[in-house]
């Protein structure tokens, strides 16, 4: 094991000693009570069984032999990634019945597509939807008639929200069930070029729509390596879904057997089975360190610098951005998938996929292999890939010995970068996250005068008017969680990329977020404290020189007398329309981004 990995893990363990102990005590108390169905009244149980088939009723009455598994689904028709889930509940119920168990559709959770809301007002609900999903999952599980969970979610806020809630029911086992990415359409690189041409006024809306629909063209996850596919990587490297199941296309012959196997596996992990493995005991500080390593090694979405601290807190584990920063110094970048390269997630899968990646990281001493997973003790089952044997049965075989495409997936001894894809920046503006995996090395440092904006529209208007045709640090404030829910600002990427390609030194500094698909332009995002809460970002003025330095982890305003500038009251921001007024309470409660931007909790 790499000594720094051990140091970071121990630091997290010590920091979390009290909160983790309290969490485990709560979980162990629930485990000791045994299956809750035995404690419910006959009237309670009759209500639960009422709509079940006669066969299911017979199974459910056999408490000591048959498990009742909750199915929580984030299906809707809007998300292409979740479209395959439409028929999953019946598939899972059938697989469970074949094992002598019952599955009940316990609840549906909301799931919004950030691609649909990007640049729109609805994006201000995106981050909070994670916590709403956690609450919705808790409501579904509150019936207390279940012995385990099957969690159906893929996209940006859905997986973190499901996992956060599942950890609060940590006395039960849980298995995530993926659906896979859509087949490749036009390349993400070609799509980005059309977006830049549209931002420059060189092509019209019809050409842009044609390009977008050629990229996002069928059921399945978007093929770039954004937050959705980062979610899938994380669930696999954390051992929460079946080995090799993340990136199998929806219509691949492997997909249905993997779905059935997930149902069978969760039934084998309940308290009614010999291999009982409650989620709360499975996910510990080692699991979360593995998650951070995976994120850094793949150049994953910066959104997880927010989600992982939130997930950790649900299990009593306290993650700090410094943990990620320290790991980034020793974890190499092993993948080149858009926006970190030209390939898509299907090319990653074809090059060797998760089994090769995890084996390489483990061989370099960069993963805890002694963790618990849904496959049992140890991470070794995840160094294998699924296939259908000669009898058509689902089996696993060792990962490929060598990467099948070294331009997409590199071995640990010859990485694309010697350090990870994410950096922590610190200075007199506070703390911020910078994704470096997609930024050319000569763009990691920018020192230029600031132009301060409070809306995305104002930035784009200045771009169209030629006001940003210079070396510039675009400062966009009042985009933090308390201000307006911390929307993603991906619509700025084509314009800023055009400026960068025109030869200007350009950077973005904001307390907002960027899409997992972003990354070509150097950006200090998630600035904490946020401007609306009195952070130093609110005191930056036009013309202040700002230094953003990914090499040395610096974010500094160089203006004389900056430290003496007084704070001032933030403006009253519009928060009505598209349901935003319903989230006013969450904006008041939400914690800073570096603490997970949590609007739910009990502290």
Predicted regions and their residues:
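Contiguous domain-boundary segments centered on the initiation and propagation of an alpha-helix
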Residues: 130-137, 144-148, 460-468, 475
């Amino acid at each position: 094991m790499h000594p720094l990995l051990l140091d970071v893990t121990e630091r997290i363990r010590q920091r979390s000693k009290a909160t983790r102990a309290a969490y485990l005590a709560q979980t162990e108390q629930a485990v000791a009570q045994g299956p809750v169905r035995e404690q419910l009244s006959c009237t309670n149980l009759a209500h639960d069984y009422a709509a079940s088939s006669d066969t299911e009723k017979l199974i459910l009455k056999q408490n000591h032999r048959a498990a009742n598994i909750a199915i929580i689904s984030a299906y809707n028709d809007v998300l292409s990634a979740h479209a395959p889930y439409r028929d999953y509940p019946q598939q899972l119920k059938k697989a469970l019945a074949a094992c002598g168990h019952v599955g009940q559709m316990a609840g549906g959770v909301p799931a919004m597509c950030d691609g649909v809301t990007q640049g729109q007002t609805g994006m201000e609900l995106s981050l909070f939807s994670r916590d709403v999903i956690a609450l919705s999952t808790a409501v579904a599980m509150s019936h207390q008639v279940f012995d385990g969970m099957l969690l159906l979610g893929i996209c940006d806020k859905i997986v973190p929200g499901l996992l956060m809630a599942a950890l609060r029911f940590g006395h039960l086992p849980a298995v995530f069930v993926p659906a896979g990415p859509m087949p490749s359409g036009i390349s993400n690189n070609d799509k980005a070029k059309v977006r830049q041409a549209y931002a420059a006024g060189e092509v019209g809306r019809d050409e842009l729509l044609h390009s977008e629909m050629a990229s996002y063209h069928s059921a399945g996850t978007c093929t770039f390596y954004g937050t959705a596919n980062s979610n899938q990587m994380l669930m696999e490297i954390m051992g929460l879904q079946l080995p090799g199941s993340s990136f199998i296309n929806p219509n691949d012959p492997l997909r249905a057997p993997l779905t059935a196997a997930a149902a069978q596996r969760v039934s084998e992990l309940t308290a009614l089975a010999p291999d009982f493995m409650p989620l709360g005991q499975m996910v510990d500080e080692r699991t979360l360190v593995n998650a951070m390593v995976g994120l850094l090694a793949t150049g994953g979405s910066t959104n997880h610098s927010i989600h992982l601290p939130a997930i950790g807190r649900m299990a009593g584990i306290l993650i700090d951005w410094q943990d990620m920063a320290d790991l980034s110094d020793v974890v190499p970048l092993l993948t080149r998938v858009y926006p970190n390269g030209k390939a898509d997630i299907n090319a990653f899968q074809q090059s060797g996929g998760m089994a090769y990646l995890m084996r390489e990281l483990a061989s370099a001493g960069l993963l805890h292999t002694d963790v618990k997973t849904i496959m049992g003790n140890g991470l070794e089952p995840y160094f294998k890939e699924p296939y259908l044997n000669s009898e058509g049965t689902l089996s696993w075989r060792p990962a490929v010995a060598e990467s099948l495409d070294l331009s997409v997936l590199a071995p640990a001894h010859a990485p694309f970068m010697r350090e990870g894809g994410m950096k922590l920046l610190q200075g007199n503006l506070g703390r911020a996250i910078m994704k470096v995996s997609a930024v050319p090395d000569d763009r990691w440092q920018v020192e230029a005068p600031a132009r301060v904006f409070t809306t995305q529209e104002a930035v784009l208007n200045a771009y169209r008017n030629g006001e940003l045709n210079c070396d510039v640090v675009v400062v966009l404030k009042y985009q933090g969680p308390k201000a307006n829910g911390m929307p993603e600002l991906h619509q700025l990427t084509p314009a800023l990329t055009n400026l960068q390609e025109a030869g200007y030194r350009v950077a973005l500094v904001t307390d907002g977020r960027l899409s997992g698909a972003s990354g070509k332009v150097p950006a200090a995002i998630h600035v904490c404290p946020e401007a609306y809460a009195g952070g130093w970002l609110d005191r930056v003025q036009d013309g202040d020189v700002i230094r953003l330095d990914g090499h040395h982890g610096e974010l500094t305003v160089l203006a004389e007398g900056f430290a003496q500038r007084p704070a001032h009251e933030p403006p009253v921001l519009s928060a009505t329309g598209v349901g935003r007024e319903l989230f006013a309470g969450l904006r008041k409660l939400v914690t800073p981004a570096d603490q997970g931007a949590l609007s739910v909790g009990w502290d």
